[in-house]
Amino acid sequence: IKVKYSSLNFKDALSASGNKGVTRNYPHTPGIDAAGIIEKTSGSKFKPGDEVIVTGYDMGMNTSGGFGEYINVPQEWIVKKPDNLTLSESMAFGTAGLTAGLCLRKLLTHGLKPDDGDVFVSGVTGGVGIISLMLFKKLGFSVSAITGKLDQEEFLKSLGANQVIDRNTLDLDLISPLQKPIYSGGIDAVGGKILSNLICST
């Protein structure tokens, strides 16, 4: 695949910094996302000229990744680019967009609706968080954005956050296993004590 676009993810930074839990062998080319054009294939699923996306699996970890000019990966790792996205747009979403989309789809499958009440997004200034906020807003939800970067409040509200909450108010030992219900659901990109407190108020 001739790579046209990639995106930068936290896992790429871990790989580049020598984290052996992500990448075992160096030298190495990171990039867990790639969008490009098939130039040659030994499989039957795709043909030369197809515009495709690769995200996840082992690419960019222990298989040369999307920051290279070319990638050579199993056809099972490849998906055809949706017709309504350009190659560059698909990488604007990348792994972060895929993660946010999968989370939101699971919530909607379980019946979450805007009328059910406020939802939260923690870690909202990261890739998964920002895309989650925008997707929730597009579907008509009222969103509480939880962040440690309060200087980004105006930016988050411009993306659709109804309120911005200081994560330090949630980064505490569990206040109570049953707290007053505040949220009908949410997407967490932080974990730990923050997630524990959010679960108890959902």
Q: Locations of the language-model features?
A:
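Glycine-rich beta-strand-centered segment in the early N-terminal region that forms part
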Residues: I1-L8, N19-M59, G65
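A structural motif shared across PLP-dependent enzymes of the aminotransferase-like
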Residues: M59-Q75
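Residue-level recognition of short, solvent-exposed, well-ordered loop/turn junctions
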Residues: K47-P48, T86, K113-P114
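Glycine-rich cofactor phosphate-binding loops and adjacent beta1-alpha1 units
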Residues: L112-K113, S144, L159, Q163-T202
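Structured surface patches comprising rigid loops and adjacent beta-strands/short helices at the edges
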Residues: N72-K80, N84
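Mid-domain Rossmann-like dinucleotide-binding core that forms the NAD(H)/NADP(H) cofactor-binding site
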Residues: M91-T169
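Residue-level marker of beta-strand positions
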Residues: I37, D50-E51, Y70, D118, ...
